[in-house]
Design a protein with these regions (language model features):
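Hydrophobic "anchor" residues on beta-strands that sit immediately upstream
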Residues: 76, 141, 182
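Gly/Ser/Thr-rich loops at beta-strand to alpha-helix junctions
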Residues: 82-87, 148-149, 189-191
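Proline/glycine-rich low-complexity loops and linkers
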Residues: 2-41, 45, 157-209
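Active-site flanking residues adjacent to catalytic metal/cofactor-binding acidic residues
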Residues: 79-82, 144-146, 185
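A structural signal for short coil/turn segments at secondary-structure junctions
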Residues: 97, 136-137, 178, 200
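Glycine-rich phosphate-binding loop
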Residues: 132-155, 160, 205-206
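Short acidic, glycine/serine/threonine-rich loops at helix termini
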Residues: 88-93, 114-117, 151-156, 193-199
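Gly/Ser/Thr-enriched, mixed-charge loops and adjacent short helices
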Residues: 1-136
Length: 209
C-alpha cells in the first residue's frame, strides 16, 4: 500500500531528525532464528487442537497421549508441492503428526517447475495429484501453488473436493469460537455457500473481486 510506505518514510525522516538515525558504535549482534521451524510447530499445534478437540477416545492415558501427539496416525496423505515451496507441509507438519506421507511428490523446490504448473487451478496439476492418490491408495491428496497461499484437495477416489465445501467446512469449525466473524472469499463462489455461512452459521460472507 503506497500510503503505508509513505508513512514509513515519514517516520524514518522524523526519527532521523531526532538523531535516532545515528549509528550505534557498538558491534551489531546477529541472532539466527529458525522461523520456519517455529511456524511448522505452530501449524502442528493448530491441527492437534482441531483434530482432537480435547478428546482422543483412547482407552488409557498412554494411548491418549500418543493419539494426541500423532492425531493423523493411520492416515495416508499425499502432498503435491509442484516443485514450489510447499514441500515442508508434508515433511515438517503432516509427518510429525503421524501421517504417512509416502507417495508425496515434487516436494523439492525447482524454479523450472519440470513436472507441472504449481497451480491448483491447472487441469494437468489436478490430474497429477488425483492419479497419485489413486495409485498410492491415499486417504487424501493436497496440492499447493508456488508460494503456498492457494491449495486444493482430492478425496480417496481422486475426486476434487469442491472449494465451496472446503470453505463451508472450515467456517463450521471456527464458527463456535468466533461467532459472527467474517469469511472472505473471491466472487467465484455459490449462492448456496453464502446462505450456509450467513443463515446456518450466523457468519458474514464478504466477496471480493
Amino acid at each position: 500500500d503506497k500510503k503505508d510506505i509513505a508513512r514509513i518514510l515519514e517516520l524514518a525522516e522524523e526519527d532521523a531528525a531526532k538523531g535516532a538515525g545515528e549509528c550505534d558504535p557498538r558491534p551489531a549482534q546477529v541472532t539466527d532464528l529458525a522461523l520456519m521451524d517455529a511456524y511448522c510447530v505452530h501449524l502442528q499445534q493448530v491441527i492437534r487442537t482441531g483434530v482432537t478437540d480435547g478428546s482422543t477416545g483412547a482407552p488409557d492415558v498412554a494411548a491418549a497421549k500418543k493419539a494426541a501427539e500423532k492425531p493423523l496416525a493411520g492416515m495416508k496423505i499425499v502432498v503435491d508441492a509442484g516443485n514450489g515451496s510447499g514441500g515442508f507441509f508434508a515433511e515438517k507438519v503432516l509427518a510429525p503428526l503421524g501421517a504417512d506421507i509416502s507417495g508425496s511428490q515434487f516436494l523439492e523446490p525447482d524454479g523450472m517447475f519440470p513436472n507441472h504448473a504449481p497451480n491448483p487451478e491447472n487441469r494437468e496439476a489436478m490430474e497429477s495429484i488425483s492419479s497419485q492418490v489413486i495409485k498410492t491408495g491415499a486417504d487424501l491428496g493436497l496440492i499447493f501453488d508456488t508460494d503456498v497461499d492457494r491449495s486444493s484437495a482430492v478425496d480417496e477416489q481422486g475426486r476434487e473436493i469442491a472449494r465451496n465445501s472446503i470453505v463451508a467446512m472450515a467456517a463450521a469449525l471456527v464458527s463456535e469460537d468466533h461467532p459472527g466473524t467474517t469469511v472472505v472469499t473471491d466472487s467465484i463462489t455459490s449462492r448456496q455457500l453464502t446462505e450456509f455461512l450467513e443463515n446456518k452459521l450466523g457468519l458474514n460472507h464478504l466477496l471480493y473481486k
